[in-house]
């Protein structure tokens, strides 16, 4: 879509591209991010208060501010502020900007607990096309979603001449109607690397790391900081407090599509034993522009005689879901391997999004919603049982 499709808001130095994400591990903090064209007094401040209050309890936080240059582009001023000690299940208003350019939004930190219901939207490889707009519209039309798990590949700026950085701005405006009101949890994809030696841009992830506060460095061997970080993160998980263990990656480990076939294999070989050992419930991936859901399988037992390995059903293993079907500019990946392998439970070359409804510590309901004209159609669904509390076989 053209830049005119997602214009900046009216008003002098108006804040734009507003998005929020979780700011701490206990659910009482939120990172508020926004962009202004100028770095004037007050443009880096977020003011927030409880919606039901009389306004006398307003609090303000000053953001950290940065900008970056990329080839012939200079970004606006990128602001990130952490608001803390929020009350659970309480609606807050927050306000950005000054004077007549003030903009107001709201957010609600959820109640926490092992049996508290919570619904995630799941999107990957979104981009900013007509199909992308349909995906986001369909997700927002369902009132259930409380946060979005995003499996990488955001703006697709690198698919345009000289990695057109204005596409990052239009993308931020595009997702703002959702991302300003509920947390989007981002994973980085290959389109976030933005490495372009031919135009002198050799710092990987420059736009992404300036715009989004999440881990972004990729690892290619078993001795990197990323490897140690993941081991430490698994140790921190307390399944009595957070029963469901969900992992976001970008390149899928189980993929029966001809596109990007086995590109995640080296990562799978390294990390899959940890996922099985720690009883990961679900792994969401993007990268392949189609939809696929696996059986619970693992591929960690190698045949000593021939050196081959074969995925086998494993009730301690995650379900692997490829959700790179958001609608990006590169189109759908419509060539699957034939016959369909036994580890693949459902696959379809269509755009769409998913909902993961956590019901309690033992059960969750998962649905994939195919884009169809002006509505979303449930094309795949399954009741999931928690691997830690109820490692039993599931049924559709």
From Swiss-Prot:
Cofactor binding, note field: Binds 1 Fe cation per subunit. Binds 1 zinc ion per subunit.
Binding, substrate: 190, 287-289
UniProt GO MF annotations: acid phosphatase activity; metal ion binding
Record carries keyword Zinc: yes
Enzyme class: hydrolase
Binding annotation for Zn(2+): 153, 190, 250, 287
Pfam families with a match to the protein in the record: Metallophos, Metallophos_C, Pur_ac_phosph_N
Active site positions, chain numbering: 260 (proton donor)
Subunit structure: Homodimer.
Protein name as catalogued: Purple acid phosphatase 5
Species name: Arabidopsis thaliana
């Amino acid at each position: 879509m053209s830049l005119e499709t997602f214009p900046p808001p009216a008003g002098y130095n108006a804040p734009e591209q507003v998005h929020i994400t979780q700011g701490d591990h206990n659910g009482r903090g939120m990172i508020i991010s926004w962009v202004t064209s100028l770095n004037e007094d007050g443009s880096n401040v977020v003011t927030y208060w409880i919606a039901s209050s009389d306004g006398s309890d307003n609090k303000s936080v000053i953001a950290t501010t940065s900008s970056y240059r990329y080839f012939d582009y200079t970004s606006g001023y990128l602001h990130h502020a952490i608001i803390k000690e929020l009350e659970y299940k309480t609606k807050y208003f927050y306000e950005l900007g000054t004077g007549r350019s003030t903009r107001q939004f709201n957010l609600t930190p959820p109640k926490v607990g092992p049996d508290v219901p919570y619904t995630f939207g799941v999107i990957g490889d979104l981009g900013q096309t007509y199909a992308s707009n349909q995906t986001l519209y369909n997700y927002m039309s369902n009132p259930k979603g409380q946060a979005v798990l995003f499996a990488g590949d955001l703006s697709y700026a690198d698919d345009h001449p000289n990695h057109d950085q204005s596409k990052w701005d239009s993308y931020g405006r595009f997702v703002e109607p959702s991302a300003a009101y509920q947390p989007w949890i981002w994973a980085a994809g290959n389109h976030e690397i933005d490495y372009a030696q031919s135009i002198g841009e050799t710092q990987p992830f420059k736009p992404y790391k300036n715009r989004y506060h999440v881990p972004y460095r990729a690892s290619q061997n078993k001795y990197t900081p990323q490897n140690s970080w993941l081991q430490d993160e698994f140790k921190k998980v307390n399944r009595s407090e957070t029963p469901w263990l969900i992992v976001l990656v970008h390149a899928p480990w189980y993929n029966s599509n001809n596109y990007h076939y086995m590109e995640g294999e080296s990562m799978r070989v390294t990390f899959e034993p940890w996922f099985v050992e720690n009883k990961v419930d679900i792994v969401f991936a993007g990268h392949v522009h189609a939809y696929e859901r696996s059986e619970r399988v693992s591929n960690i037992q190698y045949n000593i005689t021939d050196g081959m390995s074969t995925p086998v059903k494993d009730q301690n293993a995650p379900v692997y879901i490829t959700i790179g079907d958001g609608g990006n500019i590169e189109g759908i990946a419509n060539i699957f391997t034939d016959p369909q392998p036994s580890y693949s439970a459902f696959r379809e070359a269509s755009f769409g999004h998913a909902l993961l409804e956590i019901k309690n510590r033992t059960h969750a309901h998962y649905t994939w919603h195919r884009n169809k004209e002006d509505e979303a159609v449930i094309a795949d669904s399954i009741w999931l049982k928690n691997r830690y509390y109820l490692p039993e076989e599931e049924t559709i």
